[in-house]
């Protein structure tokens, strides 16, 4: 039996290409003094690791590597912690299943 070597998610994400819509991010974290449990969950739940804690203890998002999977939308949009919309036409991720 021939077993294929496993490939890390990060290695697969490397092949994707992105057309960033500068000045029009499709995800925004709303201003907060302390992060909600939902925002803290995004630090680990986002498969592209777009969310991080800054030096002031606030959650920030970098949409440049977003794969538009909707995980953050399901977790944090219902609570009002983020604003999420589809990228404008022609912008966003281009999957390259490498």
Curated annotation (Swiss-Prot):
GO terms for molecular function: iron ion binding; iron-sulfur cluster binding. InterPro entries: 4Fe4S_Fe-S-bd (IPR017896), ETF-QO/FixX_C (IPR007859), Fd_FixX (IPR012206). Keywords: Electron transport, Iron, Iron-sulfur, Metal-binding, Nitrogen fixation, Transport. Residues 57-87 form the 4Fe-4S ferredoxin-type domain. It holds the Pfam family Fer4_ETF_QO. The gene is fixX. Gene3D superfamilies: 3.30.70.20. GO terms for biological process: nitrogen fixation. This is Ferredoxin-like protein. Could be a 3Fe-4S cluster-containing protein. To ferredoxins from P.putida and C.tartarivorum, ferredoxin I from A.vinelandii, ferredoxin II from D.desulfuricans.
